[in-house]
């Protein structure tokens, strides 16, 4: 009996260790891939002007690293680059993503008015962009504009009725607004 218990214990331990090793290995690969993209894009964009997509990708990496000041500069360069390029559907999509990313970077720096302005610009370009609507509602909440936040969350729920964040926040805001 004690022998079986030891085998079970060791099997569970080996399983947990295997899971931990695999998780760490996956994280290392993900980090290396991101760092490779980061260094490649950064060196290219310091030598020459880039495309909207390249500026957006590098700015997104800076945002993930929580380097929001650098991200804001790159998001702005992406928008400027888009003005100089011939607009097609892909560029328009990246412009929308860029405005949302710019809003996120401003939000992270607690510059809510600028965040709201950029989220609205993203929504002007793509009115059914659920992520930007969620972000806009969150910025309204931080500014204590509860009725606008509730309205934005309700728009999210019209577009995506299963959005858990919008459901939870809308319920909470309904209580605040009606109280």
PLM-predicted stretches and their roles:
Residues 1-49, 53, 60, 67:
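Long, contiguous interaction/recruitment modules in multidomain scaffold/adaptor proteins
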Residues 3-19, 151, 158-179:
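Terminal, low-structured helical/coil segments at or just beyond the last alpha-helical repeat
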Residues 43-46, 79-93:
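Flexible helix-coil transition and linker loops at the boundaries of alpha-helical arrays
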Residues 44, 78, 121-122, 155-156:
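Canonical positions in the second alpha-helix
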Residues 55-62, 74, 95-106, 118, ...:
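TPR/Sel1-like alpha-solenoid repeat signature
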């Amino acid at each position: 009996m004690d022998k079986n218990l030891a085998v079970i214990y060791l099997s569970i331990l080996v399983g947990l260790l295997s899971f931990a090793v695999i998780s760490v290995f996956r994280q290392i690969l993900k980090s290396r891939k991101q760092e490779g993209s980061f260094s490649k894009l950064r060196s290219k964009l310091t030598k020459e002007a880039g495309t909207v997509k390249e500026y957006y990708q590098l700015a997104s990496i800076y945002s993930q690293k929580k380097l929001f000041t650098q991200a804001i500069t790159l998001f702005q360069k992406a928008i400027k680059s888009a003005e100089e390029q011939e607009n097609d559907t892909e560029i328009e999509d990246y412009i929308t993503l860029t405005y949302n990313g710019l809003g996120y970077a401003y939000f992270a720096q607690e510059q809510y008015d600028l965040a709201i302005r950029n989220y609205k610009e993203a929504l002007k370009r793509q009115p059914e962009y659920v992520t930007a609507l969620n972000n806009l509602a969150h910025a309204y909440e931080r500014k204590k504009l509860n009725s606008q936040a509730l309205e934005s969350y309700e728009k999210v729920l019209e577009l995506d009725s299963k959005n858990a964040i919008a459901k939870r926040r809308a319920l909470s805001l309904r209580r605040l607004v009606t109280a």
